[in-house]
Amino acid sequence: NFFEIGLTQNIARNLNLELTVKETASTQKAWDNVKELIDNGQVVGLKLDCFHLQYFSRPFHFAGHYAALYNYDNENAYLVDTKQQGGQVKTSLKSLALARAEKGPMSSKNLYYTLSITDKKFDLKTSIITAIRNNANDYINPPITNIGYKGISKTSTEIIKWFKTSKDIETEFKTSAMMMEKAGTGGALFRNLYRDFLKESYDILKLDKLKSGHEAFVEIAELWTSVSQLFEKVSQTKDFKYIQQASDILKIISNK
């Protein structure tokens, strides 16, 4: 999805890594290219529709899923996926090809990418400050109303419309709750990751503003988890009061 590849692009830029992203409409060429990289000892990031992956216990269509391919044999591909999905996992080559080539929302044409070390040096402390500053600027000054604090505010009203027009409240809200907490987000819709990143950044830089930021994100992460828990309750009860509570929490988050 946009977040995943965007995060990878930012990491590559701030740490002077070389990021190569490629797509091809040819299923055979897509595999040949990745196979060559694996044969040369390169781990390859793949964009996949997790519906086809055999290690998913509850398969569903989501074409913005990413995993790292590190080996293969005549029958299977060996990947590293989220802890939720088992960490080191395998799926058949046929299922992998289907997952890479699936069409629909958020899909790509067999997208794959690699990260490589370059000769360019970087200063970790400078990179940390740059990354946090850029993230804050993007959040405060979103180019459209669907992202940043404006996107969260908009979501607070959109979920009410969603509830009222949904034809399958149980499945839709249960799936959303699962995506927010367990689908490679680290929990709390990525906020746990950013909370921990701010803590590690403070440990390195010892800046009071980073300590304050970390403390703020401890609370923000808990609020996001509350939203996902309310979505779960909505799926179980179909009670509008839980949507209203989630909407109120999203308004609070958007103002933080």
Language-model regions, residue ranges each:
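Generic structural hydrophobic/aromatic packing signal, biased to beta-strands
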Residues: 34, 46, 79, 96, ...
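Noncatalytic regulatory segments and standalone regulatory/sensor domains
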Residues: 74-186
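Active-site-adjacent substructure of cysteine-protease-like catalytic cores
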Residues: 27-77, 81
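Charged, long alpha-helical assembly modules
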Residues: 178-256
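Exposed alpha-helical structural elements
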Residues: 6-10, 29, 33, 95, ...
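Hydrophobic, Leu/Ile/Phe/Ala-enriched alpha-helical segments that form helix-helix packing faces
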Residues: 11-15, 37-38, 256
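Cysteine-nucleophile protease catalytic domains, especially the papain-like/related folds used
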Residues: 1-27
